[in-house]
């Protein structure tokens, strides 16, 4: 089997490494020559994962046509804000009747489209039944280190879901399939917003009680907006929901938690983002999530406060204080 991977960031590289480790021939699309040379000559992604050796069956190319055309499966892993542009570039080369697996997370700024909506808008209908979406608690470095990991595979087509599940499943990588595309996407996107809040709490020196509170109430917000969009509430108790939320809010490798932590320590958002080599999806997703909650008429207190902190300059300490001063209410999820 020959597989093309679109996106040479840490997660796309990790998924490519996993598939190559299984014995598949994998080619990774990179945008710069030095990265291509480093992967092909030294088996190292010098930009994103410089301390890890990649399998020999994983190669790289700058030629998008070479990466996509004639492949038996396509894995798409660009940042969500770049996804539309990438899909427009690749669709003339896309093979028909092969699985297309998205690992992007986020909600598009402006249009407020979920990743699945972007795919279905940009690609002809003949590709739609072959689309699937991978999400779950999975740091890239730990996948490459072969640490036992679980993820969700969501597709509206059961045949596609089961095929992708079988291709990705390995000794250290277990997959669960679900038809709930919306639930998997909402969980994978909004957990990054909550992780920003958890990082701020840690940066301010608050304890684990506060982090647990943010995770708990964050799951409430994720579930509320998911239900409004038609998701199955049980999805949010699975890998792409609670699993990914816990990892992203607590793990030191979490880019979104790191951004929040540094904000809590007093750095500006501009300083933080200019120093990072990877994309923290939660920053852009916060804006989309805030606008989506306003559009749907859903109260999302944590999301609203993170938005005010990122885009209106609100002091992080005031954010936490205002969350604690909110009106008392009954526990539960209602939309």
UniProtKB/Swiss-Prot annotation:
Gene Ontology CC: cytosol
Q: Indicate which residues the UniProt annotation says bind NADPH.
A: 10-11, 31, 105, 140, 255, 279, 281
Q: Catalytic positions?
A: 191
* Reaction(s) the record says it catalyses: sn-glycerol 3-phosphate + NAD(+) = dihydroxyacetone phosphate + NADH + H(+); sn-glycerol 3-phosphate + NADP(+) = dihydroxyacetone phosphate + NADPH + H(+)
Question: Which pathway, per its entry?
Answer: Membrane lipid metabolism; glycerophospholipid metabolism
Which cysteines form disulfides?
A: none
Q: Answer yes or no on keyword Lipid metabolism.
A: yes
Q: Where in the cell is it found?
A: Cytoplasm
Pfam families, A to Z: NAD_Gly3P_dh_C, NAD_Gly3P_dh_N
From which domain of life does this come? Bacteria
Q: Which residues bind sn-glycerol 3-phosphate?
A: 105, 136, 138, 191, 244, 254-256
Its keywords, alphabetically, are: Cytoplasm, Lipid biosynthesis, Lipid metabolism, NAD, NADP, Nucleotide-binding, Oxidoreductase, Phospholipid biosynthesis, Phospholipid metabolism
Q: Which PROSITE patterns match?
A: NAD_G3PDH (PS00957)
- Under Enzyme Commission nomenclature, its number is 1.1.1.94
- Annotated Gene Ontology MF terms? glycerol-3-phosphate dehydrogenase [NAD(P)+] activity; NAD binding
Per the UniProt entry, what is one GO biological process? carbohydrate metabolic process
Q: Which PANTHER family match?
A: GLYCEROL-3-PHOSPHATE DEHYDROGENASE (PTHR11728), GLYCEROL-3-PHOSPHATE DEHYDROGENASE [NAD(+)] 2, CHLOROPLASTIC (PTHR11728:SF1)
Which HAMAP family does this chain map to? Answer: NAD_Glyc3P_dehydrog (MF_00394)
Q: Which family does it belong to?
A: Belongs to the NAD-dependent glycerol-3-phosphate dehydrogenase family.
Q: What does this protein do?
A: Catalyzes the reduction of the glycolytic intermediate dihydroxyacetone phosphate (DHAP) to sn-glycerol 3-phosphate (G3P), the key precursor for phospholipid synthesis.
Q: What is this protein called?
A: Glycerol-3-phosphate dehydrogenase [NAD(P)+]
């Amino acid at each position: 089997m020959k597989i093309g991977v679109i996106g040479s960031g840490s997660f796309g590289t990790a998924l490519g490494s996993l598939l190559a480790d299984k014995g598949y021939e994998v080619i990774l699309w990179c945008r710069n020559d030095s990265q291509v040379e480093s992967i092909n000559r030294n088996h190292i992604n010098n930009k994103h994962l410089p301390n890890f050796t990649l399998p020999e069956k994983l190669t790289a190319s700058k030629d998008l046509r070479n990466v996509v055309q004639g492949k038996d499966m396509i894995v798409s892993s660009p940042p969500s804000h770049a996804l539309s542009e990438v899909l427009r570039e690749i669709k003339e080369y896309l093979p028909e009747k092969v699985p297309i697996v998205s690992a992007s997370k986020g909600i598009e700024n402006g249009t407020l489209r979920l990743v699945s909506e972007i795919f279905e808008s940009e690609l002809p209908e003949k590709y739609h039944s072959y689309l699937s979406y991978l999400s779950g608690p999975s740091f890239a470095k730990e996948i490459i280190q072969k640490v036992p990991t679980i993820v969700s595979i969501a597709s509206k087509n059961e045949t596609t879901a089961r095929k992708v599940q079988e291709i990705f499943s390995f000794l250290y990588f277990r997959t669960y399939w679900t038809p709930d595309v919306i639930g998997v996407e909402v969980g994978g996107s909004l957990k990054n917003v909550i992780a920003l809040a958890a990082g701020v709490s840690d940066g301010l020196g608050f304890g684990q009680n506060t982090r647990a509170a943010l995770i708990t109430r964050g799951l409430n917000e994720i579930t509320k907006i998911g239900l409004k969009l038609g998701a199955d509430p049980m999805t949010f108790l699975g890998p792409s929901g609670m699993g990914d939320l816990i990892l992203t809010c607590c793990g030191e490798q979490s880019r979104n938690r790191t951004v929040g932590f540094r904000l809590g320590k007093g750095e500006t958002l501009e300083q933080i983002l200019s120093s990072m080599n990877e994309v923290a999806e939660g920053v852009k997703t916060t804006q989309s999530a805030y606008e989506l909650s306003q559009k749907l008429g859903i109260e999302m207190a944590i999301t609203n406060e993170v938005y005010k902190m990122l885009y209106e300059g609100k002091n992080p300490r005031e954010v936490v204080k205002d969350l604690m001063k909110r009106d008392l209410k009954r526990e539960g999820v209602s939309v």
